[in-house]
UniProtKB/Swiss-Prot annotation:
It is found in: Cell membrane. It is a multi-pass membrane protein. Belongs to the CPA3 antiporters (TC 2.A.63) subunit C family. InterPro entries: CPA3_antiporter_subunitC (IPR050601), Mnh_C1_su (IPR006673), NUOK/Mnh_C1-like (IPR039428). Gene3D superfamilies: 1.10.287.3510. Mnh complex is a Na(+)/H(+) antiporter involved in Na(+) excretion. Signal peptide: none annotated. May form a heterooligomeric complex that consists of seven subunits: mnhA1, mnhB1, mnhC1, mnhD1, mnhE1, mnhF1 and mnhG1. GO terms for biological process: proton transmembrane transport; sodium ion transport. This is Na(+)/H(+) antiporter subunit C1. The chain crosses the membrane at residues 1-21, 28-48, 72-92.
Amino acid sequence: MEIIMIFVSGILTSISVYLVLSKSLIRIIMGTTLLTHAANLFLITMGGLKHGTVPIFEKGTSSYVDPIPQALILTAIVIAFATTAFFLVLAFRTYKELGTDNVELMKGAPEDDRE
């Protein structure tokens, strides 16, 4: 099962790199969001996809699940949600000001830098 998850994580990473390299600001934001999801999937897979009980020590239980990767992923999901929301608001404001979401057209004129 781990090998399938590694391949899925690799496919998600390649799709996200493709999106990040595009010219549309919304596609770049979705690419970074997808990249965080791919990294989260990779980390949870490396933490081990095994069956066990919660890490509360009880008599008669031999295998426990490691809670550290799960806590790390939960924190990463919250941070990714906050940054994605910020980037979307920033992209909306940029679109309202400039009238485009193409990053090639957002470049300033060389005359603006001299002042």
